[in-house]
C-alpha cells in the first residue's frame, strides 16, 4: 500500500470519535466497529461484529482456514482515549493532520495504526496465503478490557492460534524497531487510618494524640529507603534481556531535563523488571478547607507494579504485611486490597519472534531493541492464560519518543506503519 493510501485510511479511522469510556460516544464506538468490519469484509474475509453482555463491539474475522497451515491471530483495538484539555492540542484531535512525516490525531498511534497494519498485511498476502489469518479488533481496551475473559470464553474458536501478534505496543525510539518482551503486573489497595475519636481542636489534642495524616505519612515513608529503594520484603525481580534506556531519553519522555532520578545501575531494569510503588491519591481535608483540628481520618490509594514473573496474590500479601508491620503509635489502620493482575513474559527466542527480528533488521535502518513495559496490558494476561501454548508477540507502529499516546498531540510516524507492514508480511511468508 502506498503511503498516501495509509494516510487516507488512517485519517478516516481517526475521524471516528470512538471513545469507549464516554457513554456519549457509544454510537461512535459502534460506527468504528462497523467501519473495521467493512474493511475486512471487503477483502473477502469471514467477518462479524460481536458484543458480549456489558461489552463494547469487537470485530473478528478470518481467512479460509487450511488445517495444514499454521494460524496467526492479529490483534489491535479500535477504541481510543478521551482527548482531555483541548487547549493543549495544537490541532483538532479528530481532524487528522500530516506534518513532518507524522499523522496527528487521537488514536493515530494507539491503536488505529494497528488496524491499518493488519488490514494491509492481509491485503498483501491474500492471493497466496502462507498461513491462516484470524483478526481480532477489540473495542474496549482503553477501559481495561473488562469483558475480555467472557469474550474469549464465548469465541474461543475464533481466536485460538499458534501465534498471537498484538500490535498495541510500540518502538522505543523513532526508527528503532522494537519487540516488547515483558509487561509488569499490578496490585493496588487503600490504606485507611481511622482514629477512634472525634475531630478535636488542635489546642486540646495536638501533641497528645497522633492525627491521621501523621500516621499515614509515616506508613507511606516506610515504603522506601533514602536511596529510593523499595523496602517491601518478599518481592522478586525478573531477569530478562532488555535494551538499556539512556537517562537523557527517559528525561525527554518525562518532559523535563531538570527532574532528578533515583540512582540505579540500570534504568531499564528498574523500570521494566523490578517492583515499584507509587501513591496515587490521598483523601484528607483540602488545604483551602483546613481548620485547627486534629483529624481522625485519612486514606491513601497505593499502586504496586510487579516484576513480570511475580505472583500477584503473593505480592498483595507482602504489601498488606508491610503496611500492618509499619503502623506507628498503635494507631487504628486497615489495608483494603483492590485490583491485581499478573505480568507477562513474551519470549523473544521463540520462532516467530526470531524471524520477525530478522525481518526488522533487514528492513529498518536500525537493529531491533528489546524493551519491557512498565505498565500492564490487561487483555494480554487473558491471552496467556487461555492460550498458553501460543507464541505471544508484542509490537506496534507507535513510538515513545513523540507518540504522546493518551496525551495531547498524539501522533504516529507514517513510515513506521509501512515498515511494520513489510516486516510482518515477510515474516509470515518465511514461517510458512
What spans do the regions from the language model cover?
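A generic structural motif
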Residues: 109, 197, 304-311, 341
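A common structural junction motif
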Residues: 78-79, 223, 227, 321-330
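Active-site nucleophile and cofactor-binding loops and adjacent substrate-binding regions
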Residues: 50-53, 107-111, 370-375
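Fold-level recognition of mixed alpha/beta catalytic cores in primary-metabolism enzymes, strongest
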Residues: 108-258, 268-275, 386, 408-419
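An extended, acidic, His-containing surface patch that forms the Zn2+-binding/catalytic region
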Residues: 173-174, 231-289, 293-297, 309-318, ...
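Active-site metal-coordination/substrate-binding segment of hydrolases
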Residues: 69-137, 403, 415, 419
